[in-house]
Design a protein with these regions (language model features):
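Transmembrane beta-barrel domains of Gram-negative outer membranes and organellar outer membranes
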Residues: 21-151, 162-166, 174, 179, ...
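Flexible, surface-exposed loop regions and adjacent strand-edge segments
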Residues: 80-83, 157, 199
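Active-site glycine- and acidic-residue-rich loops that bind
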Residues: 159-161, 196-197
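A contiguous pocket-lining binding segment that forms or flanks enzyme active sites
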Residues: 201-210
Length: 226
């Protein structure tokens, strides 16, 4: 009987030790794997300067935004010290209200001065970049419809007053300091001049670079193709 007990102990204890080793190794491997979490605060707001970012207004939050497009800075193009390098010349003013239906879906309305546009918009966050790079970029879809109330003989019917815009917004946060956004855009205008086209494509890009925890440099640029 004693021999049988000794034999059982010899068999069981090494097995238990091996199982404990396997469990410990598995725990260490799981801890070493990067956790899959969404990358937060890629940009601080839903717009950089003139272009949209991947960000949306959070659920049940309201964003009221007044944007100004000033005049030319250079003296040769109408700017100069007499109008404070374009600041006195407001080329466009846009007042918008945006609301977060969910953390990924926002809607909005706006009024723009230049073409006397009334706008409706929607933006949806399709994908969020993850910390483990399983999803390397954030992707959002944006759509806007504008209706001009400008008094013009060119608008012979109301259908001419509509402009439609759709965007696919691609963004990546490369580090805690640098975030980049790239925006291909398609625009359809129901009414255009004789030498213009109804459908146009454009590319926009921009970045945010944080040089202190509370200060950043932001930049964006857009180019019409064709």
């Amino acid at each position: 009987m004693k021999k049988l007990i000794a034999f059982i102990l010899i068999v069981l204890f090494p097995s238990a030790f091996l199982f404990a080793q396997d469990d410990l190794l598995k725990m260490l491997q799981d801890e070493s794997k990067p956790k899959r979490e969404p990358v937060l605060a890629m940009f601080k707001t839903n717009k950089l300067i003139n272009i949209h970012t991947n960000e949306t207004v959070r659920k049940r939050n309201l964003d009221v935004r007044i944007s100004h497009l000033f005049g030319n800075m250079g003296k040769e193009s109408g700017g100069g010290v007499h109008n404070l390098y374009g600041i006195d010349q407001s080329a466009d003013i846009r007042m918008g209200v945006h609301y977060g239906i969910t953390d990924h879906l926002m809607v909005g309305v706006a009024r723009a001065k230049r073409n006397e546009d009334l706008e409706g918009l929607v933006k949806y966050r399709i994908l969020d970049q993850t910390t483990d790079n399983a999803i390397p970029v954030s992707v959002s879809a944006f759509a806007n419809i504008a209706y001009s109330v400008k008094e013009s003989a060119d608008f012979k019917n109301d259908n001419y007053r509509f402009v439609y815009c759709s965007q696919l917004i691609l963004a990546r946060k490369f580090s805690s300091r640098l975030s980049v956004v790239f925006v291909p855009t398609f625009t359809h205008r129901n009414f255009v001049g004789a030498d213009d086209e109804n459908n146009t494509w454009s590319l926009s890009g921009g970045f945010r670079f944080k040089f202190t925890p509370s200060a950043s440099v932001i930049f964006d640029y857009s180019k019409t193709l064709g």
